[in-house]
Regions:
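Extended, helix-rich structural scaffolds rather than catalytic motifs
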Residues: 47-215
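Long alpha-helical, hydrophobic tracts
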Residues: 1-52
Length: 215
């Protein structure tokens, strides 16, 4: 079974068919470990022949918290996520594209894991929105606040394990980024958050990543 098939099998259980949020989210660490083991085995037999490349994340629109989530996952799994903006209709309408740059197996793992964690985050997000609607009559800004909190928790947990597994981004990935996006710049995303929603998202993210129910 190839690495992509193993990851797909690992992430096959979904919330919709009976897997809990916590069980599904704990797969993130398992995917990281699988990627780490995969590259160690290739190195041991001298067969690490993959080359870095980029592919577009299939998404109609991307919110700021989703950009941070995909960037977090990519950087902790030997890849980079680049956001590119294109204007249409006389430079009036802007569409954002997210490119994942990395080795083939790593890219596939990043995209699969992002799609899984994004779904999980949205489940908690809806609960938080419903809470604020019932308590305060509206949920303005709650979704993004929860999303940023959730993403921060994922970042802390995945960064910790990436260091333990020595998941180092190959130089070829940085070279490919420069080839594809020679004018790329790093920009800081500043947002104002609802403290309760942010803390709820962060708590749920940490709880999900620490559960070993499907290990």
């Amino acid at each position: 079974m190839d690495i992509k098939a193993k990851i797909e099998k690992l992430l096959a259980k979904t919330i919709e068919n009976g897997c809990t949020v916590e069980e599904a989210a704990s797969a993130a660490k398992m995917v990281q470990r699988l990627i780490g083991k995969y590259h160690i085995e290739l190195a041991e037999v001298g067969n690490e022949t993959e080359t870095a490349d980029g592919e577009v994340l299939d998404a109609k629109s991307v919110r700021k918290w989703e950009i941070r989530l995909i960037s977090t996952i990519a950087r902790n799994m030997r890849c980079e996520a680049i956001v590119s903006h294109r204007y249409t209709a006389g430079n009036i309408n802007r569409k954002s594209f997210v490119y994942i740059v990395g080795m083939d197996a790593d890219r596939k793992a990043v995209i699969l894991l992002y799609e899984k964690l994004r779904k999980i985050c949205k489940v908690g997000m809806r609960k938080e929105q419903n809470y604020h609607k019932s308590m305060y009559g509206n949920a303005k800004g709650i979704a993004d606040s929860y999303g940023f909190g959730f993403t921060m928790a994922i970042k802390e947990e995945m960064t910790k394990q990436a260091k333990a597994l020595v998941l180092v981004k190959p130089k070829e990935v940085d070279d490919k980024v420069q080839e594809l996006f020679p004018n790329v710049k790093t920009r800081r995303v500043n947002v104002s958050c609802n403290a309760h929603a942010y803390d709820s998202g962060m708590s749920d993210g940490h709880s999900a990543m620490s559960v070993s129910a499907i290990e």
